[in-house]
């Protein structure tokens, strides 16, 4: 009756089961020793092991992978009892077309995972200093590069960490400082195929960016009147630029609601249609710059607009005017690193914000081409240190999925990332994140992570408690597995990804 109830009511199943243990030895004496040890170990668990006298051949054939059961002695076990035996209780991660993430510490099987299969593709790579976080990140980038030939990988590199890997993979490293003439224009915009509604969306996004930029410089939220001035200036700048580009391409200017300002009409004869510029060349040659916004604020002629213009001056006439030039770098390479280590520390966050606005445009362009973009941001916690910038990051974190983009934040300063001031925004970021690579964590950081990631069991979190370098937990959606991504010190890939002389080779 009990068995019938378990089957009918509890949906249990029973199986005819044979459990055989195969062990080998070089000598008969060693064989006897192993047999005795196994029997003693089993007896501690109230199990009895018996030798297969006169049935060695049948037992051996049953153990082998032929799927033949010649050993006919069976016992009836329920599915719940069978679940206690390995490997049935071991979680595996083996996505089709996934990239390699090391060895599962429990089953010793390889881990293959694909972020594109997740509902929310964004991720975080977290680990304290010396945990192997940098090597893990570089290994992931290399696997992505080799396994996804159509995708583009973009890296924001505040510490000159990724240059050697990018160069080895024939990628492009762009170093930004006042001594080098590498320029990115955050105001670049592609108007190809953009109608009036699309123009309004672009104006809204660029106004949001400039508002965030000025707020980060002022270290405060902007007043409603200030926001109105900036919004009006951005509207004028991009509406005029849109109308001018329409004329350059021989399109009917009446299709938009804006006329070309007189000062821009003066330039039209120099920009003849005979130049036959490509879309990319038009974007670089004719997009507005921060100078246009700065001049627009001055043209407003009020004390408040002059104050806002003064806040922007460092990016126009000051030490960070490298962002006030037309783009002159090639962003077409599949692997591009933006090295901003040469920028001043007190302006690094603002510089990262400008770079992210530029990269958002690149991601949107890739999306039009049905191309995936992977954006890695090292020292990610710095972007959350300024409230206005954190809001911008949160918005991009949410919307990038629609543009076939994947953001991966990399950070080691967990205490900064998880402080009370950032808690609200971090919760919003984590709720839109399904990929986590957790390497070694301090006890304090582990407790905070357990609060933010309640779906990972305390037992699993033991794998990151002061773990060995190169080991930790990988969470992909609902699946969490402990990984071991240590590699041989003699391998070529180890020489490429290891930059600190220690690494986590074995």
Residues of each region from the PLM?
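Extended, folded cores of ATP/NTP-driven motor/assembly subunits in large transport
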Residues: 1-81, 86
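Conserved lysine of the Walker
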Residues: 133
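Conserved H-loop
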Residues: 157-158, 378, 402-405, 410-419, ...
């Amino acid at each position: 009756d009990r068995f019938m109830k378990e089957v009918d009511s509890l949906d249990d199943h029973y199986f005819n089961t044979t459990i055989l243990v195969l062990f080998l030895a070089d000598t008969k004496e060693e064989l006897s020793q192993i047999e005795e040890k196994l029997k003693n170990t089993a007896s501690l668990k109230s199990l009895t092991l018996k030798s297969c006298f006169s049935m060695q051949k049948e037992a051996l054939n049953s153990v082998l992978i032929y799927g033949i059961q010649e050993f006919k002695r069976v016992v009836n076990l329920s599915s719940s009892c069978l679940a206690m035996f390995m490997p049935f209780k071991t979680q595996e991660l083996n996505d089709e077309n996934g990239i390699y993430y090391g060895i599962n510490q429990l089953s010793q099987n390889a881990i293959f995972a694909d972020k594109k299969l997740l509902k929310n593709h964004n991720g975080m790579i977290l680990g304290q200093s010396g945990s192997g976080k940098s090597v893990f990140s570089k290994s992931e980038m290399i696997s992505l590069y080799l396994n996804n030939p159509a995708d583009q990988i973009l890296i924001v590199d505040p510490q000159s960490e990724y240059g050697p890997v990018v160069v080895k993979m024939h990628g492009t490293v762009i170093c930004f400082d006042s001594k080098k003439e590498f320029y990115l224009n955050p105001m670049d915009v592609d108007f190809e195929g953009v109608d009036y509604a699309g123009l309004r969306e672009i104006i809204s996004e660029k106004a949001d960016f400039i508002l965030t930029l000025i707020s980060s410089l002022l270290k405060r939220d902007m007043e409603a009147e200030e926001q109105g001035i900036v919004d009006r200036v951005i509207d004028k700048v991009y509406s005029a630029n849109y109308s001018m580009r329409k004329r350059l391409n021989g399109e009917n200017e009446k299709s938009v609601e804006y006329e070309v300002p007189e000062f821009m009409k003066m330039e039209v004869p120099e920009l003849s249609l005979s130049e036959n510029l490509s879309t990319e060349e038009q974007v670089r040659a004719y997009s507005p710059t921060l100078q246009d916004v700065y001049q627009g604020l001055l043209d407003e002629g009020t004390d408040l607009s002059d104050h806002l213009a003064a806040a922007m001056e460092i990016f126009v006439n000051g030490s960070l005017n490298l962002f006030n030039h037309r783009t002159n770098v090639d962003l077409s390479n599949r692997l591009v690193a933006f090295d901003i280590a040469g920028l001043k520390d007190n302006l690094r966050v603002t510089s990262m914000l400008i770079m992210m606005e530029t990269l958002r445009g690149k991601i949107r362009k890739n999306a039009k081409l049905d191309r995936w973009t992977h954006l890695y941001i090292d020292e990610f916690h710095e972007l959350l240190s300024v409230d206005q910038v954190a809001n911008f990051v949160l918005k991009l974190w949410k919307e990038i999925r629609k543009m076939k983009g994947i953001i991966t934040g990399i950070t080691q300063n967990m205490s900064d990332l998880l402080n009370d001031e950032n808690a609200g925004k971090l919760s919003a970021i984590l709720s839109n994140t399904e990929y986590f690579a957790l390497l070694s964590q301090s006890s304090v950081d582990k407790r905070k992570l357990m609060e933010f990631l309640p779906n990972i069991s305390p037992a699993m979190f033991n794998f990151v408690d002061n773990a060995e370098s190169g080991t930790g937990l990988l969470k992909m959606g609902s699946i969490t597995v402990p990984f071991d991504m240590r590699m041989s010190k003699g391998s070529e890939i180890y020489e490429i990804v290891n930059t600190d002389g220690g690494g986590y080779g074995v």
